[in-house]
A protein has these predicted regions:
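The feature marks the mature, well-folded catalytic cores of soluble enzymes
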Residues: 2-4, 10, 17, 21-375
């Protein structure tokens, strides 16, 4: 296009209309946030023809922030979860007995297969609610970041639905996840706390109902964490000691399937601990073998329980096949009695790091448990 003879020379301007200089203080702007996290948002000039006047571009009117009834995902009236795509997944630092039992060549993951297996779980959960994906930093050595159940716990019983406790990892390869989790939830506007003693997330602390939780300690988490939580957040935590080194997180041996019923590997705890837990929930006993096969490593959706099963990779008639089919039938019977179905996912690539399905999912709320089903 030919420039008019009397037109002024073109100069490069910032989006706020200033020419290579500081922000124009006369332009409308918004301040978002509080304290040191305030963010300045400038209004952009209109670029449409109708916005051009004889004195130059007309500025857009200041716009108020949307008055959403929700401040964060936890407050949504639908199931909400946090997952992480396995961009940084690796098995180079064996940090649990399952990994140490595997030779290096059998522990190496098939990344394409891992991606397919992850997406099958993700697609199923996202069909029932909102799934946030935790970003993976490019320069981080975070082999277990995809196991978001260990990142922390959102405290369901607090009325503001805005408080999260981030993990203080015992496992050295996972300690870099703590600052990442703090930043993620701070950016989302949560009140963020870091556990003062060792603690590895909701995989170790299961919500039952109201302010009642059950917490596991002794291998990856410390009892001092739960004492601090009780004093700080008005919680009642039934504390149970974990002693089986292969079942090193509580989600391996306890699974609240409804607000009233909880699967418990009763042989893994003392009689006193089981009696105390029975005061608060109806215990559905499961065997040690069923725990080893992952019956408690499940995730509850509104009318469905998700569980990992690689039974089609196993040879019929073998001991491993028998363990797996026994676990599956037990879970199906339990779910049938509670008017729920079971959905199975082959997560064999994640077995290489000692993980099952519940490890991959962090609850941002417990809306699924508000739905009562009747058989």
């Amino acid at each position: 296009m030919k420039m008019p003879k009397n037109a002024p020379p073109r100069t490069k301007k910032h989006s706020n209309g200033t020419q290579n200089g500081p922000l124009n203080q006369n332009l409308p702007s918004l301040l978002i946030g509080t304290g040191e996290h305030k963010e300045l948002v400038m209004q952009m000039p209109l670029s449409t023809r109708d916005g051009n006047g004889r004195h130059g571009l007309k500025l857009a009117e200041p716009v108020q922030r949307g008055l959403s009834p929700w401040l964060n995902p936890t407050q949504l009236n639908r199931p909400t979860f946090l997952m992480n795509f396995p961009f940084s997944y690796a098995t180079g630092s064996p940090n649990n007995p399952w990994m140490k039992d595997l030779p290096d060549q059998k522990r190496a993951p098939d990344f394409k297969r891992a991606a397919v297996q992850f997406l099958q779980v993700y697609q199923n959960i996202s069909a029932e609610g909102l799934v946030y994906l935790l970003p993976t930093p490019r320069d981080g050595d975070l082999q277990d970041l995809l196991y978001t159940a260990n990142l922390g716990i959102v405290l369901e019983h607090l009325p503001d639905k805005n408080t999260v406790v981030i993990s203080n990892f015992k496992s050295p390869p996972r300690r870099g996840e703590t600052p990442l989790g703090v930043k993620f939830f701070q950016d989302m506007g949560y009140n963020v706390h870091v556990a003062p003693a060792k603690f590895e997330g909701e995989a170790e602390l299961k919500h039952l109902y109201d302010n009642i939780y059950v917490g596991g300690y002794g291998i990856r988490s410390e009892i001092e964490t739960y004492e601090w939580m009780e004093q700080t957040f008005d919680m009642r935590i039934i504390k149970v000691q974990e002693v089986e080194k292969y079942l090193y997180h509580l989600d391996c041996s306890i699974f609240p399937i409804t607000k009233e019923n909880t699967l418990v590997g009763t042989e893994l705890f003392t009689k006193k601990e089981v009696r105390e837990l029975a005061k608060f929930t109806n215990i559905i006993p499961v065997s040690v073998d069923e725990c080893f096969s992952g019956i408690c490593n499940s995730v509850r959706l509104p009318n469905q329980v998700l569980n990992s099963s690689h039974i089609h990779d196993l040879k019929a008639g073998t001991q491993d096949y028998q363990y797996e089919i026994t676990k599956n039938r037990k879970l199906e019977d339990i779910c049938s009695n509670l008017a729920m179905e079971v959905a199975y996912f082959n997560l064999s690539e994640f077995h290489k790091s000692g993980a099952l399905l519940s490890c991959m999912v962090m609850h941002l709320n417990r809306h699924c448990y508000k739905i009562a089903l009747t058989a």
